[in-house]
A protein has these predicted regions:
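Structural motif
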Residues: 159-164, 200-201, 315-326
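Cofactor-binding loop segments of dinucleotide-utilizing enzymes, especially the Rossmann-like FAD-
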Residues: 9, 38, 189
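Alpha/beta-hydrolase fold catalytic core
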Residues: 307-315
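Conserved small/polar residues in nucleotide/adenosyl-binding loops
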Residues: 336-341
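N-terminal Rossmann-like or analogous alpha/beta NTP/dinucleotide-binding catalytic cores
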Residues: 12-19, 23-153, 157-158, 170
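Short, hydrophobic/amphipathic alpha-helical patches that form generic packing surfaces
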Residues: 166-177, 325-335
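Glycine-rich, Lys/Arg-enriched anion-binding loops that position phosphate/diphosphate groups
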Residues: 123-160, 167-306
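Extreme N-terminal starter segment of soluble prokaryotic enzymes
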Residues: 1-4
């Protein structure tokens, strides 16, 4: 029996994810698909829009044979650590033969070549990288230009500009790092662009679906919905727009559990975060793994302007501190007392 492993977030599950499961089984010839999925927090450093058990149920209804939770320390980490944690998990299961991931380029050879360069760090590539950094380029731009120079191509941005291509490269690096016997495959992503907020026919991005669910929640703020009248509510009409975007079994779950188990948003934790930060000093904040001294001081200096969780993260942004990095750094402050010794 052959098993294909999938690394996912399903935030939320949609047609593109079902296609991923089905196509992965097809291209690998595997008999079953095993999923490693982020839990209640995702890689952007924010809560998943719905609980992990509901998302896992959707995956099981749509072709997955088993769903395992990726520990939160990896699920909310950088692309490199996210990939390393997930690949290590699949490798340690000891039953996974293939890893199949979606990419924009659908070019396994090209992705593998870049992954090998980043793993081996040949002297010529390292020289180009250091020169670019000394010239003041940001690390992503410096790395992209160094790879282009080393590989002898005019521009490799088509392989490094998309988040899914970047994750694909990190999966390939992780397979090498753990010396895994798992064989990689990639398939062309069918859904819209990662950041696309517009619903498309059949394959929409998770971002677009989250936006619609957020809008439906705002509608319900002034609506009293009961089970008997659900089909006649504005919310029912809004959610029915997803009929072509998510599998029927998932749409039924979305209708059943809206305002019961989901949606969950970053701002739902605003009071908790404000309370935690009011009880912290810069010295105590830097004990959290991803909180630098610079970020700790910015938190302290801007705390009086805290309006809500999301707004505060946006307020803390700088050229060097992206919002995603800030999200990841603050997340452990809100849910744990554990800090570095």
């Amino acid at each position: 029996m052959k098993i294909v492993g999938l690394i996912t977030e399903y935030n939320p599950f949609h047609n593109g994810h079902q296609y991923h499961i089905q196509k992965s089984l097809e291209v690998t010839g595997a008999d079953a698909a095993i999923v490693v999925m982020s839990g209640d927090y995702v890689q952007r450093g924010t809560p998943a829009i719905m609980p992990k058990h509901l998302r896992a149920e959707m995956a099981l209804k749509c072709g997955a044979c088993a769903v395992f939770e990726l520990p939160v320390c990896y699920a909310t980490a950088t692309a490199e650590l996210f990939a390393l944690g997930a690949v290590s998990f699949l490798d340690q299961l000891g039953v996974v033969d293939y890893l199949c991931f979606g990419s924009e380029c659908n070019d396994l050879d090209g992705l593998t070549k870049i992954a090998d360069i980043l793993c081996d760090e040949p002297d010529e590539y390292t020289k180009f990288l250091k020169e670019n950094l000394r010239a003041g380029m940001s690390f992503p731009a410096a790395r992209q230009d160094a790879l282009s120079s080393y590989m002898g191509i005019s521009d490799c941005s088509f392989l490094l500009s998309d988040p899914n291509n970047i994750l694909s490269i990190e999966y390939l690096k992780a397979l090498r790092r753990v010396k895994s016997r798992i064989q990689p495959f990639t398939i062309k992503r069918m859904e819209s662009d990662y950041h696309d907020q517009t619903l498309r026919s059949t394959y929409s991005s998770a971002s677009a679906i989250r936006s619609l669910l957020a809008y439906s929640s705002s509608v319900l703020q002034t609506q009293q919905v009961t089970g008997e009248t659900f089909e006649n509510t504005p919310f029912s009409s809004i959610l029915n727009e997803l009929e072509d975007q998510v599998p029927k079994s998932c749409l039924a779950l979305l209708k059943d559990y809206h305002k019961v188990l989901y949606p969950v948003y970053q701002n739902d934790f605003s009071l908790l975060m404000k309370y935690k930060l009011l009880n912290k000093t810069p010295q105590s904040l830097i004990r959290y793994m991803d909180v630098s001294e610079t970020l700790a001081n910015r938190i302290q200096n801007n705390l009086n302007d805290f309006f809500n969780y999301k707004q505060f993260c946006e307020l803390l942004k700088t050229r060097e501190l992206t919002q995603t990095r800030i999200n990841r750094a603050l997340l452990p402050v809100s849910y744990t007392h554990l800090t570095l010794p």
